[in-house]
């Protein structure tokens, strides 16, 4: 009985400890406690505490639940719900009981007990209303979207609630079906990082319109493309929803353009996307407060990214007079409205020396600052990239600057090779998985063309001809997803793959040749991460 009721036993007088130890069955022990409470000899909550311990003991002896092998989201088979007349008992089982421990109070509570699918540890926690709602959805196979509407929740909030319970282990869920080619990431490869093998989020970068209120000197596409009819736009949302459900990933839409806010029905499109439970973000230009407030009322933005191309004079030469100051005012507005903000810079030979001065000016004004190298296509063909050796020196300087400015992000994948060489932690690079072209990311243009990456011509289909699932699994998409053959043996390939857009603009074979700015050769024999 000492191993079955350790917490309860600690709270018993010595005479009752001996009686508990002498009990032949757990039922006899519980009866002893009930009698002691009735005679006012024991703390009144001890029988309920003992019943929790009994369930936890049974759970600990159960087989470890399956991890990511279920076909649908489901209850952890070891999960049990235990009604209790007392609140605060779980604290006594989870290492509480010190001088600061609050005495359990007489109030009904449901306690959840389960074995974690990953750690095999037994967890004992009081059930909140949201936790019970998530369990009900899984147990009864309910539609999360319908439940969200019935309970006055946003679908995304309910999706997050379900994912939270999956992370905690009270629910089990199928693994993401967005899996890297084993030549890129595999547990069999000692230099690979398994956490980059599966993508939990799929992003559709949707260029909803070509209309733009700027005319930037490095724009990669000024072609005229009409936006799709409303019914087709709704079909896109449904196709993305189906893709995410069947591939067991969270969907995200990053609206961009042009300027996405110039789409004639953008607010309605945003509302429809929210109703399907997607994470929503914007890559756009500064806008008015009222527009942001209206969007926030529908669903808080996951992020708003604007672009700056250097210090004020150079930026306004690229993006137009007054753009720099408008952008600074807009960043203040994003902070005021508590919208996550990001500034993106397109790096050229003209502004490379302005990146860090600009970052210092933005310190405290933006949540994240990143850059990508110029894709010299479209109007960007008139600009130039820096020389590779100059860029290599810059990358080292940039990484060192991150020590004083941790809001500097790594979006250019080749920075990870420098991180590796300088014993710094590598990051997910451009999309969280190195080059994510046609892996955890696709671009949809205003007229329905689907590209692996928007920064260079990489068409893999048309949304009017095929749905996203068909396009994603096409041979052409797989080619972009695999990337250059020269990269496959690289020590940082799981978080790199170079930049296909830069390579394509340089005229190299992107299926064979590595990024012309790459600093690495092939992986050396026996080299490990």
Predicted feature residues:
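Cysteine-centered iron-sulfur cluster-binding motifs in ferredoxin-type domains/subunits
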Residues: 207-215, 438, 487-494
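A glycine-rich beta-turn/hairpin centered on an aromatic-Pro dipeptide
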Residues: 54-100
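Radical SAM enzyme [4Fe-4S]-AdoMet core and its adjacent flexible, acidic
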Residues: 223, 228, 276, 300-303, ...
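Conserved alpha-helical substructure of the radical SAM core
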Residues: 182-294, 302
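Low-complexity, glycine/alanine/valine/leucine- and proline-rich hydrophobic stretches
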Residues: 80-136
């Amino acid at each position: 009985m000492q191993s079955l009721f350790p917490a309860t036993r600690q709270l018993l007088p010595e005479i009752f400890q001996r009686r508990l130890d002498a009990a032949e069955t757990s039922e006899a022990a519980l009866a002893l406690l009930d009698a002691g409470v009735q005679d006012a000899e024991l703390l009144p909550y001890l029988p309920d505490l003992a019943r929790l311990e009994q369930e936890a003991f049974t759970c600990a002896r159960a087989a470890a639940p399956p991890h990511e092998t279920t076909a649908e989201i489901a209850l952890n088979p070891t999960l049990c719900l235990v009604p209790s007349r007392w609140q605060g008992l779980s604290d006594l089982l989870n290492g509480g009981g010190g001088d600061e421990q609050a005495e359990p109070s007489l109030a009904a509570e449901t306690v959840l007990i389960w074995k974690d699918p990953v750690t095999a540890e037994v967890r004992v926690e009081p059930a909140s209303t949201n936790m019970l709602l998530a369990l009900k959805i899984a147990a009864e196979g309910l539609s999360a979207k319908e439940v969200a509407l019935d309970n006055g929740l946003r679908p995304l909030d309910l999706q997050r609630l379900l994912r939270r319970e999956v992370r905690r282990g009270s629910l089990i869920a199928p693994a993401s079906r967005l899996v890297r080619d084993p030549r890129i990431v595999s547990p069999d490869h000692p230099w690979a990082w398994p956490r980059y093998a599966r993508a939990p989020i799929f992003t559709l970068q949707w260029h909803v319109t070509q209309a733009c209120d700027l005319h930037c000197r490095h724009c990669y596409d000024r072609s005229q493309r009409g936006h799709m009819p409303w019914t087709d736009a709704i079909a896109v949302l449904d196709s993305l929803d189906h893709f995410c459900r069947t591939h067991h990933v969270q969907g995200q839409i990053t609206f961009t353009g042009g300027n996405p806010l110039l789409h004639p029905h953008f607010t309605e499109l945003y509302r429809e996307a929210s109703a399907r439970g997607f994470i929503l973000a914007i890559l756009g230009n500064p806008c008015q407060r009222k527009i942001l407030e209206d969007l926030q009322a529908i669903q808080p933005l996951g992020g708003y990214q604007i672009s700056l191309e250097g210090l004020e004079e150079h930026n306004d030469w690229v993006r137009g007079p007054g753009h720099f100051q408008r952008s600074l005012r807009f960043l203040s507005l994003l902070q005021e409205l508590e919208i996550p903000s990001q500034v993106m810079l397109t790096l050229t030979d003209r502004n490379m020396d302005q990146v860090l001065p600009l970052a210092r000016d933005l310190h405290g004004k933006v949540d994240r600052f990143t850059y990508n190298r110029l894709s010299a296509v479209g109007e960007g063909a008139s600009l130039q990239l820096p020389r590779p050796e100059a860029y290599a020196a810059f990358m080292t300087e940039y990484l060192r600057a991150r020590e004083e400015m941790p809001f500097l992000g790594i979006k250019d994948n080749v920075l990870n090779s420098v991180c590796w060489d300088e014993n710094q932690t590598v990051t997910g690079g451009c999309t969280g998985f190195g080059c994510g072209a046609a892996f955890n990311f696709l671009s949809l243009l205003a007229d329905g063309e689907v590209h692996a990456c928007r920064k260079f011509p990489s068409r893999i289909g048309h949304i009017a001809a095929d749905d996203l699932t068909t396009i994603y699994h096409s041979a052409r998409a797989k080619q972009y997803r695999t990337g250059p053959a020269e990269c496959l043996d690289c020590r940082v390939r799981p978080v790199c793959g170079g930049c296909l857009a830069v390579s394509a603009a340089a005229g190299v074979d992107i299926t064979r040749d590595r990024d012309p700015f790459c600093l690495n050769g092939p992986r050396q024999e026996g080299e490990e991460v």
